[in-house]
Design a protein with these regions (language model features):
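Membrane-interface loop-to-helix entry segments
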Residues: 73-92, 145-170, 199, 203
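Generic alpha-helical transmembrane segments of integral inner-membrane proteins
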Residues: 37-41, 119, 123, 207, ...
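Specific transmembrane alpha-helix
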Residues: 46, 202-213
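Helix-loop-helix junctions and helix-breaking kinks within/between transmembrane helices
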Residues: 190-202
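Membrane-interface loops
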Residues: 48-68, 99-189, 212, 216-230
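N-terminal transmembrane-helix/juxtamembrane module of multi-pass inner/ER membrane proteins
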Residues: 4-96
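Hydrophobic alpha-helical transmembrane segments
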Residues: 30-34, 111, 177-181, 199, ...
Length: 230
């Protein structure tokens, strides 16, 4: 027989001071985020909105203002960095590794994750097409090439690198994962410096890589269970 809930059964009425201090001691991360929630609620409701006639405020652009000026003054350097980025982080190492885990090692999880991620990126990128950031520095060595149209939200470069790095860590390829994470960080700095992405594109790219890697893992587990049942 079920019982009706009453306020006297509320969990918080059973808390003691030891429980409160234990929360701070054993769960500092949620406590930190609780304080952060209150802080950013204050920031959000006191900050003035950016008017439609003004460019978006981006803290990443502010932090990389000097590097942006350097690249504006040196188009050759911008092209060299774009070429290195394309070959090392995106087209070269990232794509080769993710496809290689499937066709060579027989582990399709990273490939499935990348397919999930890029499909979702295409849908979201088309659904909300953000304006090109002011001061964008295109390059013929970039991917997508030159100034052709591309979706800003979210960064497929960053998300793909995260997917590859997570697979490396699962396989205990720690040195390679560290190299990929380092290159991805440098890629983030470069994309901000060239105004190729907003900060939110890059941050969500990290989260998307982790999310779709998790989705791919669940898909592979379910697919394996279905095959075993058959």
């Amino acid at each position: 027989t079920s019982k009706w809930w009453s306020l006297s059964n509320a969990t918080f009425l059973q808390w003691t001071m030891a429980d409160v201090f234990g929360l701070l001691k054993y769960h500092p991360v949620p406590c930190f985020f609780a304080v952060s929630l209150l802080f950013f609620m204050g920031v959000e409701y006191t900050l003035r909105m950016i008017p439609p006639s003004s460019p978006p405020f981006d803290i990443g652009f502010v932090a990389t203002a000097y590097l942006h000026r350097v690249l504006v003054a040196s188009p050759t350097l911008n092209t060299v960095l774009a070429g290195l980025n394309t070959l090392s982080v995106f087209v070269g190492m990232q794509t080769a590794y993710i496809i290689g885990t499937w066709v060579i090692e027989g582990r399709p999880r990273a490939t499935v994750a990348a397919l999930f991620m890029f499909t979702c990126r295409g849908i979201l990128g088309y659904a909300t097409q953000l304006p090109l950031p002011e001061g964008f520095l295109g390059s013929g060595a970039d991917f997508p090439v030159g100034n052709v149209s591309f979706f800003l939200f979210y960064s497929g470069h960053v998300a793909g690198s995260v997917i590859a790095s997570l697979d490396m860590k699962r396989m205990h390829r720690w040195e390679l994962a560290f190299l990929f994470d380092t290159l991805n960080l440098l890629q983030v700095v470069r994309l901000l410096s060239t105004r190729g992405h907003y900060t939110i594109d890059l941050a969500i790219g990290v989260g998307a890589g982790m999310l779709f890697d998790s989705f791919a893992g669940k898909y592979m587990k379910k697919a394996a269970a279905t095959t075993d049942d058959a």
